[in-house]
């Protein structure tokens, strides 16, 4: 009652918030350090469903550059690895992830696949999420032609699978390393006929520089911009096939306010062909989606003042 008089709160909803805040500030947190850390520093978040998207983050399978690069970082400077394609082991990793995507039912949930426009990511994207049973007799273009990027693989069908588009902003760390330089879009369109390249503005690679390496801050900012761009898309469940550096620096830059174990789960380096399912939340009204599952109530209309609000109003009047 003293709290009510002091703050002159007469609006019921404001009063409830005030009482809730006062209760929390008055609670003694005499609990174990682990519980305190989890409950105080990493509380549960609650958001409207229509302001959330599920994203399936995938790092590409093993590329030819990874084999030597993981032994000696300087190997990434070799022009032999220009726009590196997948190794045969990489294709086996693709096959394994494809089996998981189908056995788990993800192939029925994913509405859109976004791929970085490099050979290894597009090979991974079409191999994991593409259709099956392509024949030359089909009048539908394949996602990938036979033996694209020295794959020794048959053509991959574009039937019965989500659309696959490419987007420059989810590319790997730009500059210096030839493995991260892309070919012309004209070349890719021949190798990946049914992949959508319409978002790529330039045929030649104007983003990659031989003597300038993108800073980590620039990469992280690009990653955040990419995630914000997802809110311009209508799809709610999106697979993104991209790169280790892009994923690591983008996710770490988000500074998630969560338990350290959860943060580690989100931000640790991805293995080749690893998939992680995550939810992103539009907390800044970036998107304009309207909920298709919410229901406004009051149909037909009637008196429906909540009983707890009525009690609060009665208590105020008693004073």
Residue spans for each PLM region:
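Intrinsically disordered, low-complexity basic segments at termini and long loops, enriched
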Residues: 1-28
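Beta-strand elements within well-structured catalytic alpha/beta cores of enzymes
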Residues: 54-58, 114, 236-246, 250
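Active-site-proximal alpha-helix that buttresses catalytic centers in soluble enzyme cores
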Residues: 30-161, 165-166, 186-191, 216-223
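Glycine-rich phosphate-binding loop signature in dinucleotide/nucleotide-binding domains
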Residues: 104-108, 230-236
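Surface-exposed cleft-lining segments at the edges of enzyme active sites
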Residues: 77-84, 171-176, 203-220
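A short, acidic, amphipathic alpha-helical segment used as a generic capping/interface helix at domain edges
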Residues: 219-233
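Acidic, low-complexity terminal tails and accessory targeting/binding regions
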Residues: 19-55, 64-73, 134-156, 172-194, ...
